[in-house]
Design a protein with these regions (language model features):
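N-terminal leader/linker segments that precede catalytic domains of diphosphate-processing enzymes
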Residues: 1-246
Length: 246
């Protein structure tokens, strides 16, 4: 009988929701498309981001040590908090050409951890930030091969029609963003929200593959309910956010 596979430690990572208000109302978020040569979800649309590097801890940010830790709800050390903010800004520059001179302008939006069953795992902090005035993001044609501004609700509609490939955390994040009507609303909510690490749990529930999130009655550990707690696979193999049963 084979021994159970050891759980792979997650790699620290950061991703950024670059936001801009639209002249006709509402707002858009910038997304990039993975290369078809990518080892994970080739062709999927994602938010700019990547792994935290050791040298990220050496770069300054305009926040005190106390403010840094508060930004992450006390979940990270000062050095790790700084590394994640700097990594977020660096990845945006590398993938889109947009320079965020002050990483402290970004606020924590969510925190996702790849399930333990996966062989490649990431511990990713999602940040929300306003696109600098007059910035013109693009894509590097290497790691990402296309890019576009999308209304969150429109992106969800395109996903539902099979026109857009999204990973579950990206889908859930777009669903979360679609609740707001402006960049100010998103950033105000990010400043005020209590972020809990989301480590999805895959189960078959009532004959459907289901992703359980913290707060769900079937989730393996007790956590506060911060929103819908289930993402259920529907027709065409696409995921849909649903509220957990009472």
């Amino acid at each position: 009988m084979s021994e159970p596979r050891a759980v792979v430690p997650p790699t620290p990572a950061a991703t950024v929701l670059l936001l801009r208000d639209d002249p006709v109302g509402g707002f858009s978020v910038f997304m990039v498309q993975r290369s078809m040569k990518s080892s994970f979800m080739p062709g999927a649309y994602v938010f700019p981001g990547g792994k935290v590097e050791d040298e990220d801890a050496e770069q300054p940010v305009r926040l005190s040590d106390q403010e840094l830790q508060q930004r992450f709800g006390g979940e990270l050390s000062v050095g790790s908090a700084r590394s994640h903010l700097v990594a977020a800004a660096r990845e945006v520059a590398e993938e889109t050409g947009v320079l965020l001179d002050d990483p402290s302008c970004m606020h924590v939006f969510s925190h996702w951890v790849t399930p333990e069953i996966e062989s490649r795992r990431f511990d990713t902090w999602f940040f929300a930030g306003r696109m600098p005035p007059d910035a013109s993001p693009t894509h590097d044609d290497f790691e990402v091969v296309a890019s576009k501004w999308v209304h969150p609700a429109s992106a969800l509609e395109s996903y539902g029609n099979g026109e857009l490939l999204l990973a579950p955390p990206t889908y859930y994040t777009l669903w979360d963003l679609a609740r707001f009507s402006s960049v100010d609303e998103v950033l105000d909510d990010a400043v005020a929200r209590h972020v809990v690490a989301i480590q999805p749990e895959f189960r078959e529930v009532e004959g459907r593959w289901t992703i359980l999130l913290p707060g769900d009655p079937l989730y393996p550990s007790e956590s506060p309910v911060l929103g819908p707690t289930r993402i259920v696979m529907g027709e065409g193999g696409r995921w849909w956010v649903v509220q957990s049963p009472a």
